[in-house]
Amino acid sequence: MTVNRPRGTRDFLPADTARRRYVESVMRNVVRNWGYSEIITPTFEHLDLFTLKSGEGIVGELYNFTDKGGRDMTLRPELTAPVMRLYVNELQPFPKPLKLFYFENCFRYERPQKGRFREFWQFGVELIGSGKSDSDAEVIALADALLKAVGIQGDMKLGNLAVIRTLLKGLEPEIVSKVMRLVDKKEYAGLESLLEEIGAEEQLKSDLFHLIHLEGKYILPKVKEIVGNIPELVGFEKTLKLLDAYGVDYSLDFGIARGLDYYTGMVFEVYAEGLGAQKQVCGGGSYQLIQLFGGGDVPSTGFGIGFDRIMEICPLVPPASKNLVLVSKPATHIEAVKVASELRNYLPVQIDLMERNFKAQFSYANTINADYVVIVGEKELEAGKLTLRDMVSGEQELLTLEEIIEKITGQQD
């Protein structure tokens, strides 16, 4: 019987894995330089964690199950809610703001397509405990810095949900949620039908459609004509000035609503070319989610980067590392093991594990593109030396182990 991997998942071969780990390390270094610390949360959580405020779209895609104790559990579909749960359980006494990041796999039962999988990896940041404009600006600027560090120049769109909610303040909360979802998906025909169905005033319909179609860097005066100079826009304008100071390139789009119901104010998304229909590589915003899980009314800002989508268009490749194969005969194999142990302090080393003859060992070294071969022969050992062959140039030298180490480490530098 052949058992294949589940639909919507992937296997990563050594070269793919090395590249992913390298890009991941670049991103980790960036966020650490901004003062963020890594956390890890469980792969599965209680179902309630995600049904409270994640939105209908995500709830319908959960990999949920009942465990042997009769508890409703689910594989995590995203990581903001688990981080908030972690904060309530463990981190409330810590000094604010808390600056956290994570890199974990998530699971959603959705139709697999280019750039979208049922198991996917998310790199994210959460800044907990500050609702100031400076915090929003830092988080957005950090997202921008991360994408630039991996060679991606994205198209950043910023909005503020307080603007749309000001327009919709006379509607029932469930209607507001429906409107926000339709706006987020840009289902304008469905939005128009919903507004007709609830008997919305013509002025509301006109203002809403005008607002969500406004785009550009300098549209705030037009936005104020629609909703007035509401307090949320004062802080938002300060955020924009700070982003200009950070050197972040952005445009405003008040049609951004995000697919998660817990965002409250500033929201942003970043799009990149080369991904087909799934162009979004990063999204986030400000939220107040902690009180849902038993904590206080703590403002937070964060974002998630779709790591799998990043990898489809990221130009980074790991720097090449030298590798070496030791060739020996049965009579010198023990010495070869000792030599390998010493050389592994300086570069990756492989020895023969298949009892191959000399010719087959050299053939294997060629097959794996080894940079060097060290021959551990009886004559070499009698002379207290080894033969180093450069597999690129073909040059061969009889050297002591110390000379080989010096030569190899010098070439690596």
Swiss-Prot record:
Presence of keyword rRNA-binding: no
Pfam entry (one): HGTP_anticodon
EC top class, as a word: ligase
One record GO biological process: histidyl-tRNA aminoacylation
UniProt keywords, alphabetically: Aminoacyl-tRNA synthetase, ATP-binding, Cytoplasm, Ligase, Nucleotide-binding, Protein biosynthesis
GO cellular component, one term: cytoplasm
CDD domains per UniProt: HisRS-like_core, HisRS_anticodon
Catalytic activity: tRNA(His) + L-histidine + ATP = L-histidyl-tRNA(His) + AMP + diphosphate + H(+)
Gene Ontology terms, MF aspect: ATP binding; histidine-tRNA ligase activity
Enzyme Commission identifier(s): 6.1.1.21
Family: Belongs to the class-II aminoacyl-tRNA synthetase family.
Entry-linked HAMAP family: His_tRNA_synth, HisZ
PANTHER family in the cross-refs: HISTIDINE--TRNA LIGASE, MITOCHONDRIAL-RELATED, HISTIDYL-TRNA SYNTHETASE
Descriptive protein name: Histidine--tRNA ligase
Gene name of the record: hisS
